[in-house]
UniProtKB/Swiss-Prot annotation:
Residues 1-20 form the signal peptide. Belongs to the LCL2 family. Keywords: Signal. The keyword Iron-sulfur does not apply. It comes from Aspergillus terreus (strain NIH 2624 / FGSC A1156). This is Long chronological lifespan protein 2.
């Protein structure tokens, strides 16, 4: 009688382990065919940008990165002002650099030091 109970217990243990295995593989391979739709990345399409460029109303300089209308190219704003800092390099040119976690003005200070050969 005790061997019969042990056998039944072993079978129940095996069945529960097998159930757990199948649930693992079901989730791993797409939930048994019930996969959720994920949004896909938008493919690169220059026609969309070109149409926005063509429809922009500007009689001065149209910034290529932001489509802002400004008087001079070095007045163009950075595309991501909350994480980028605009640094004017002189001769009417400017670049946008990532702050990289530095405080305000630190990125421009590092660029200036690099231009002087001190960094």
């Amino acid at each position: 009688m005790i061997s019969w109970i042990r056998t039944l217990g072993a079978l129940l243990l095996l069945a529960s382990v097998a159930q757990a295995q199948f649930q693992f593989f079901e989730h791993m391979f797409g939930n048994g065919g019930h996969q959720q739709q994920r949004s896909q990345n938008v493919p690169s399409d220059s026609a969309r940008y070109q149409s926005m460029w063509d429809s922009a109303q500007c009689d001065k300089y149209l910034c290529p990165g932001t489509l802002a209308c400004v008087h001079f190219p070095h007045h163009c704003p950075c595309p991501h002002p909350d994480v980028e800092e605009k640094v004017e390099l002189g001769e009417g040119s400017a670049v946008c650099v990532s702050r990289g976690g530095y405080r305000q003005g630190e990125a421009s200070r590092k660029i200036e030091l690099a231009r002087k050969g001190l960094l």
